[in-house]
Curated annotation (Swiss-Prot):
GO terms for cellular component: membrane. InterPro entries: Glyco_trans_19. It catalyses: a lipid X + a UDP-2-N,3-O-bis[(3R)-3-hydroxyacyl]-alpha-D-glucosamine = a lipid A disaccharide + UDP + H(+). Signal peptide: none annotated. Belongs to the LpxB family. It holds the Pfam family LpxB. Keywords: Glycosyltransferase, Lipid A biosynthesis, Lipid biosynthesis, Lipid metabolism, Transferase. The gene is lpxB. Disulfide bonds: none annotated. It comes from Methylobacillus flagellatus (strain ATCC 51484 / DSM 6875 / VKM B-1610 / KT). It is an enzyme of class 2 (transferase). This is Lipid-A-disaccharide synthase. Condensation of UDP-2,3-diacylglucosamine and 2,3-diacylglucosamine-1-phosphate to form lipid A disaccharide, a precursor of lipid A, a phosphorylated glycolipid that anchors the lipopolysaccharide to the outer membrane of the cell. One of its GO terms (biological process) is lipid A biosynthetic process. Its EC number is 2.4.1.182.
Length: 378
């Protein structure tokens, strides 16, 4: 039975991995998948050696704190694949974990595919040599990435983004509100503080205080907070009580981020894949992020681009506002959101750009990615 080694490190990678496994099994039902998988990949038949949550660490300080455990897991996973050699290994995102693992496997003659280029165009250009040593084939989600790899002599395929295939070109706000039993004429704000516990801890207080300020200006406002785990939900609920927000019209949802954003007039979102989902749902948004100050100082020194949010990177300009770190305060966040919603020409510009983006990224991603992987299997 042909075996594919596969490692994902967080929720967005789990989603990508689950769709890729499904596409591969359509063409080769005999394939076996083993590595580190999240719940969606496991549901598609992947076997996991460790819980994926163990890899979900972000920020330099946080990684240092968890480093011994991460190194131990990586060593054990590498040894497993050397003892049970897969036909090909796929690393999904998680570059700091996967590139070292991929380099070890590639040096032992195991082909390696990396799915999702790291942000070398933003702050990791020095990593291209490490990528050359580690990766047999790169699967790039964004159209500006392949040229960087071709110039460095790395085999690459532009596959587009699976979210662009999954999401309809025109969202249905009215239908989403009917399903969620929300008034059609209310202001609805979706708030997405991230998928990791550390992200939600950093942003929960900010989002709740911002919701209070928005409500003081717009008493008809409703707030939707989709969270994917019990742990992140508990963190947000504790923050609600700590900020005396128990009377706020906030609905905490288990997942259903797409539905929440479709029902919303606007989105407040942590920097990450959810910003792209909001763009593909054509929603005006404010991108936020907070991290421990030391991590922020290190990140600032490494950054090449003036923006961090994927919609702005793809647009090549600040199509939506970013309020990061010390700028991420309730007064600014509430005022910026209300001002944006009052400017119809700004919203029209945002939505036009997001439609263009959607068309560019819609590439039948799963099939293209599967084809590239299967080229390594006899």
């Amino acid at each position: 039975m042909p075996t594919i080694g596969i490692v994902a490190g967080e929720a967005s990678g789990d989603l990508l991995g689950s769709h890729l496994i499904r596409a591969l099994k359509k063409q080769r039902p005999d394939l076996k998948f083993v590595g580190i998988a999240g719940p969606k990949m496991i549901a598609e038949g992947a076997e996991t050696l460790f819980p994926m949550e163990r890899l979900s660490v972000r920020g330099y300080v946080e990684v240092l704190r968890h480093l011994p455990g991460l190194l131990k897991i990586r060593k054990e996973v590498a040894q497993y694949f050397l003892d049970h050699r897969p036909d090909v290994f796929i690393g999904i995102d998680a570059p700091d974990f996967n590139f070292t693992l991929e380099r070890k496997l590639k040096h032992q003659g195991i082909p390696t595919v990396h799915y999702v280029s790291p942000s070398i165009w933003a702050w990791r250009r020095g990593k291209i040599k490490k990528i050359q040593q580690a990766v047999s084939h790169m699967l790039a989600l964004f159209p500006f990435e392949p040229e960087i790899y071709r110039q460095a002599g790395v085999a690459v395929s532009y596959v587009g983004h699976p979210l662009a295939d999954m999401l309809p070109m025109e969202p249905d706000m009215e239908g989403a509100r009917e399903e969620l039993k929300l008034p059609q004429d209310s202001l609805v704000v979706a708030m997405l503080p991230g998928s990791r516990q550390s992200e939600v801890q950093q942003l929960a207080d900010l989002y709740i205080k911002t919701a209070k300020l928005i409500l003081s200006e717009r008493p008809d406002a409703r707030f939707l907070v989709p969270l994917i785990t019990r742990e992140t939900r508990a963190i947000f609920e504790r923050a609600l009580y700590a900020n005396e927000g128990y009377d706020l019209p906030v609905s905490i949802m288990f997942g259903h981020a797409h539905q929440a954003m479709e029902a919303a007039n606007a989105v407040i979102v942590a920097s990450g894949t959810a910003t792209l989902e909001a763009a593909l749902i054509k929603r005006p948004m404010i991108i936020t992020y907070r991290m421990p100050n030391l991590s922020w100082q290190i990140l600032k020194r490494m950054k090449y681009l003036p923006y961090v949010g994927l919609p702005n990177v793809l647009a090549g300009r600040f199509i939506v506002p970013e309020l990061l770190q010390h700028d991420a305060v309730p007064d600014k966040l509430a005022a910026t959101l209300l001002q944006m919603l009052s400017d119809k020409s700004q919203i029209a510009d945002i939505q036009t750009e997001f439609r263009r983006m959607h068309e560019l990224l819609r590439q039948n991603t799963e099939e293209k990615a599967a084809r590239a992987v299967l080229s390594f299997i006899k």
